[in-house]
Amino acid sequence: MEAIKGSEVNVPDAVIAWLLDGHGGVKPLQDDAVIDKDHPCWLHLNYANPESAQWLTETPLLPNLVRDALAGESLRPRVTRMGDGTLITLRCINGSTDERPDQLVAMRLYIDERLIVSTRQRKVLALDDIIHDLNEGSGPADVGGWLVDACDALTDHASEFIEELHDKIIDLEDNLLEEIVPPRGVLALLRKQLIVMRRYMSPQRDVFSRLASERFSWMTDDHRRRMQDIADRLGRGLDEIDACIARTAVMADEISQTMQESLSRRSYTMSLMAMVFLPSTFLTGLFGVNLGGIPGGGWHLGFSVFCVALVLLIGGVTWWLHRSKWL
C-alpha cells in the first residue's frame, strides 16, 4: 500500500494524532510525516467535533461505507472486512456498578496496515492504558499489536466490572441468609446490568474469535494467539454473567418468599391478639350496653372485681393458646 502524508490525516481537533515509532513509543503527527507499514498512524477522533466530522465525511483514505459507520449510530460489536482494511465496532465499560449501563460506550475502528482510525463520542477509559504504555515507550509497535492491546484493555475493564457485580451478589446473598432484604430496585438494577453486559459482550467475544482466525496481513501468529486468549477470557466472563443472572433469579424468589413469610407472621400475630382480647371485648361491650344498669355498679368493689376477671380471662385464653401450641 502507498504511503500517506501526515497532512492528509492531521485533523486539528483530533483527540489523538500520533505516529507509532515501531519501538513501543509514539511521536506527534507532523504534516511532513510519512505514514507507512513501519510507521503507522493512530488517529483518535470524537465524531461530535466539527472538524473531525468533516474529515470523516470528506477524506478519500476511507471507503464510503466506513465513513458512515465511523460516525453513525451505535451498533452491537461486529467486524467487517472492506478491501485492504477492516471495520470493527466494540463496546467498553466506563461506569461503576451503581450506574445503569443501558448503553455501553461504543468505539469504532478502521484499521489497515498503515492507519488506525478510532472514533467515539464518550471517552473510552480503556484506551488510557494504551496511551500510558505508548507514552512510556512500552506500547504496541505496529497496527496488530495496537488492536490486541486495545481488545485486552477492553476485556480487562469488562472483567473487573463483572467481578464487582459478582461481589455485590455475594453480599446480597449473605444479607438474605440473615433475612436482610435489599432496598427496592437494587436487585432490578443488578439484573439490568448483567443482561446488558450479556447482550453486548457475547457478540464482542465472537468479534475477538474472528479476529484471531482471520489472516490479516497486519497481524502475526503471536497476535492471533493473544487475541484467541482474550476471546477465551471474555468467554469465561460470559459464563460468570450467566451464573450471576441465575443467582439473581434465585434471590428474587428468596426475597419474595421472605416478604411473604414476614407478612404471614404479622397477620398471624394480629390474629392471636384478636383471639386474646375478643372475650374481654365482648364482656366490656355487654356491660357497657347499660340497658338495665351496670351489674355491680352500686358495689364499691365492682369495678376492681371486673378488672381482675378480665385479667384472669385474658390469662386463661393465653394459656389455652400456648397449650394448643398456637403461641
Curated annotation (Swiss-Prot):
Pfam families: CorA. The chain crosses the membrane at residues 274-294, 301-321. Residues 295-300 are periplasmic. One of its GO terms (molecular function) is cobalt ion binding. InterPro entries: CorA_cytoplasmic_dom (IPR045861), CorA_TM1_TM2 (IPR045863), MgTranspt_CorA/ZnTranspt_ZntB (IPR002523), Zn_transp_ZntB (IPR023714). SUPFAM superfamilies: CorA soluble domain-like, Magnesium transport protein CorA, transmembrane region. It catalyses: Zn(2+)(out) + H(+)(out) = Zn(2+)(in) + H(+)(in). NCBIfam families: PRK09546.1. Belongs to the CorA metal ion transporter (MIT) (TC 1.A.35) family. This is Zinc transport protein ZntB. The lineage of its organism: Bacteria, Pseudomonadati, Pseudomonadota, Gammaproteobacteria, Enterobacterales.
